């Protein structure tokens, strides 16, 4: 099996677990990702959220609109550019944040069970490098360019 296949399997398994567990707090598939990033980055705009999560802007727009309809996030016009909408977590959304963080911490601890601290640090460092390696391709393809393979 390839490294990317393993990363994909891990990501899908953890995402599936989270989606099932977050049904209890009325979060639909993948919405926890957006809620957490907005909570961590108050005032984030759609483009920044798109780049942070490596998803297209239309996906971000649909997801935050659903969170807004549930009263978990709210948008405000940016002071410096009225065309930009800044996103903030509401009081209702803030109440879910600790539960999501607890699930994330549990999943990380369970996933890394049996790894030494040095191994965890090395793995994180390598994964950051992998992400850096793909960022250029992601940005190029997002702008309509084709990769040469």
Language model regions located:
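C-terminal regulatory/oligomerization modules of transcriptional regulators
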Residues: 117-149
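Pre-recognition alpha-helix immediately N-terminal to the DNA-recognition helix
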Residues: 13, 17, 33-36, 95, ...
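The alpha-helix within a helix-turn-helix
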Residues: 50
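N-terminal leader segment of winged-helix/HTH proteins
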Residues: 1-25, 141
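Residues within helix-turn-helix
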Residues: 46-47, 58, 65, 85
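Charged, amphipathic alpha-helical coiled-coil/dimerization segments
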Residues: 65-128
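Short, locally clustered residues in the helix-turn-helix/winged-helix DNA-binding domain
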Residues: 8, 36-40, 101
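Short capping segments at the starts of secondary-structure elements
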Residues: 41-45
């Amino acid at each position: 099996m390839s490294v990317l296949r393993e990363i994909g399997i891990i990501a899908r398994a953890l995402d599936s677990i989270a989606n099932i567990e977050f049904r209890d707090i009325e979060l639909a598939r993948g919405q926890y990702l957006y809620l957490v990033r907005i909570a961590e980055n108050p005032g984030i705009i759609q483009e920044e959220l798109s780049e942070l999560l490596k998803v297209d802007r239309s996906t971000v727009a649909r997801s935050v609109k659903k969170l807004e309809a549930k009263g978990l996030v709210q948008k405000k016009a940016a002071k410096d550019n009225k065309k930009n909408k800044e996103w903030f977590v509401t009081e209702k959304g803030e109440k879910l944040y600790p539960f999501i963080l607890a699930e994330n911490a549990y999943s990380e601890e369970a996933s890394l069970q049996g790894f030494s601290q040095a191994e965890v640090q090395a793995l994180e460092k390598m994964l950051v490098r992998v992400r850096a390696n793909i960022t250029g391709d992601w940005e190029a393809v997002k702008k309509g360019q084709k990769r040469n393979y």
